[in-house]
């Protein structure tokens, strides 16, 4: 599940209504598909122009990521921090200005190439997590 980029604001500090809606969504999915694994993907970086005309990460983004991470923990579902995968603070501008570009000039949305890049990073994270799980599990399966 990846929702929330458009609720982020420059001064956003309280995302309780968003979280309440997401909790309801996650709970409905758990009831409808009890065997399904659920992954919450955080919002990515989103830039805005300061009064001085400089591009900066919108202050509400990191706060929203924290809310999303807490939601995943509270609901016992997986979480992937796309903001950090993008490169964290200021990464949207880097993606826009990459050659070839990985994001749109609205400094909000990734493009197809950016999506493909991030999908690769998510895939690598999932494979790494599975490998770590298998290694830990091997210790429990050994006989003393």
Language-model segments: residues:
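Generic structural signal for well-ordered alpha-helices
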Residues: 22-27, 65
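Generic, well-ordered alpha-helical scaffold segments in large soluble proteins
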Residues: 25-28, 32, 71, 125
